[in-house]
């Protein structure tokens, strides 16, 4: 199932969030936006968290490195990491083509509601156009 960027929520730090309910629990799949991938350009390395790690909103959980810069990745949600996209670090070029499907980074079992600071697509596009 392809993710529609217009249905996702976004952090100011360019992570996207796709929330799904499974068996009464809520899970958030998290990745970085196409805008962030474009700005970083030529990705060379990504550091991912371990499954089982507990994250708080705003906590750094990894980093992505390009030939231009090293950028931390921040958790836009609170919860436990239940899955990590282990194929991603070896296939970073695919992020340029598919930041929203292949480009997912981790899946978190939510321990709290989504923060109100997460933006909808229109607000995120506005932030990107002002930054771009």
UniProtKB/Swiss-Prot annotation:
InterPro entries: 2-oxoA_DH_lipoyl-BS, Biotin_lipoyl, GCV_H, GCV_H/Fam206, GCV_H_sub, Single_hybrid_motif
SUPFAM superfamilies: Single hybrid motif
PTM sites of type N6-lipoyllysine: 68
Pfam family name, one: GCV_H
GO cellular component term of the entry, any: glycine cleavage complex
Keyword Phosphoprotein set for record: no
Cofactors demanded by this protein: (R)-lipoate
Annotated ranges, domain Lipoyl-binding: 27-109
Keywords: Lipoyl
CDD domains hit by this protein: GCS_H (cd06848)
Top-rank taxon, per record: Bacteria
Biological role stated in the UniProt entry: The glycine cleavage system catalyzes the degradation of glycine. The H protein shuttles the methylamine group of glycine from the P protein to the T protein.
Family membership noted in the UniProt record: Belongs to the GcvH family.
Subunit structure: The glycine cleavage system is composed of four proteins: P, T, L and H.
PANTHER family named in the record: GLYCINE CLEAVAGE SYSTEM H PROTEIN, GLYCINE CLEAVAGE SYSTEM H PROTEIN-RELATED
Protein's name in the database: Glycine cleavage system H protein
Originating species: Rhodopirellula baltica (strain DSM 10527 / NCIMB 13988 / SH1)
């Amino acid at each position: 199932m392809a993710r529609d960027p217009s249905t996702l929520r976004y952090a100011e730090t360019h992570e996207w969030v796709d929330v799904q309910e499974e068996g009464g629990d809520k899970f958030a799949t998290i990745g970085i936006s196409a805008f962030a991938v474009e700005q970083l350009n030529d990705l060379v390395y990504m550091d991912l968290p371990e499954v089982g790690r507990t994250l708080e909103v705003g906590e750094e959980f990894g980093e992505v490195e390009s030939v231009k810069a090293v950028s931390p990745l921040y958790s836009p949600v609170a919860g436990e990491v239940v899955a990590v996209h282990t194929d991603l670090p070896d296939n970073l070029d695919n992020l340029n083509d598919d930041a929203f499907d292949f480009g997912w980074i981790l899946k978190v079992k939510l321990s709290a509601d989504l923060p109100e600071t997460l933006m909808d697509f229109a607000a995120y596009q506005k932030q990107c156009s002002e930054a771009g």
